[in-house]
Amino acid sequence: MSTTDAAIPQPNPHATAEQVEAALKDSKLAQVLYHDWEAETYDDKWSISYDKRCVDYARDLFDATVPAEEQRRLPYEHALELGCGSGFFLLNLIQAGVARRGSVTDLSPGMVKVAIRNGESLGLDVDGRVADAEGIPYDDDTFDLVVGHAVLHHIPDVEKSLREVVRVLKPGGRFVFAGEPTTIGNGYARNLSTLTWRVATNATRLPGLGGWRRPQAELDESSRAAALEAVVDLHTFDPADLERMAHSAGAVEVSTQTTEFTAAMLGWPLRTIEAMVPPGKLGFGWAKFGFTSWMTLSWIDDNLWRRAVPKSWYYNVMITGVKPS
């Protein structure tokens, strides 16, 4: 059963032009507006589910980061997700047997509400609250595990947030953050996404292809949200620099892993096309093609390219560390 620790403010899923303008000068306001806007469609946008596919994916990320001897001692009793979004990482890790119960936090009220709703639908023991990652509203030594997926690059002061993570962990507790963009990977992903958007936009203006384009009102709203994306995406990371930050925050047993090289080169163009095409237009065949192709390239990246490609060239970096006992 899921509960909230405190009343969650009302989300604002449709920011006005004036609010967007104000958010361009305030990164935390931008985080709230952007992620409130995305909250109700976030799972569809990123093909997130809470079935075996994503349960296995989340567990694979965890297992790739955490030492095998610690995996044999699972589950953790109480886990926190920082920047929970729709709850993808923690809810699927709980289902995978990593933790018994969880707390979800996000700066966006909309995301917290969706994450709690998802937890309720799964029958999981999850509570949640709106929270700033630079000032986590929990007591010292509260959690056995802290996790996050694609959150650190949104936080203005990453090292300050990691210090907060170490503070709320129990002695010997572990953190695992996955899905963070590397500096090199982010560069090629952004360029591929921009090129795909331009080509696809021009193609849907051709005779007979207008039905493959979302209504202009939706695209205009997407443009307002996209204007905030440059404000909310604050950092990219070199794996070695991220490790140094975690050490400076007081963590020990720090290590990083990277994932997705050619898989990211395919995944970003596919996601860009999905963002501009009306929902349901591409069909199951497209989804199956995208997932199967991405899985194949991910295997190649992990088992072949890793022997020759530098760690920092991969798109995603994951980091783990432990609070000293």
What are these regions (language model features)?
Residues 159-171:
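A short glycine-rich, Lys/Arg-flanked "PGG" loop and its adjoining helix->strand segment in the class I
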Residues 262-303:
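C-terminal helical/coil "lid" or tail adjacent to the Rossmann-like core of SAM-dependent
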Residues 225-241:
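Acceptor-substrate binding/catalytic loop of class I
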Residues 134-145:
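A short acidic, Gly/Pro-enriched loop at the edge of an enzyme's catalytic core
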Residues 80-82, 86-135:
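Class I SAM-dependent methyltransferase SAM/SAH-binding core
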Residues 251-262:
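Conserved S-adenosyl-L-methionine
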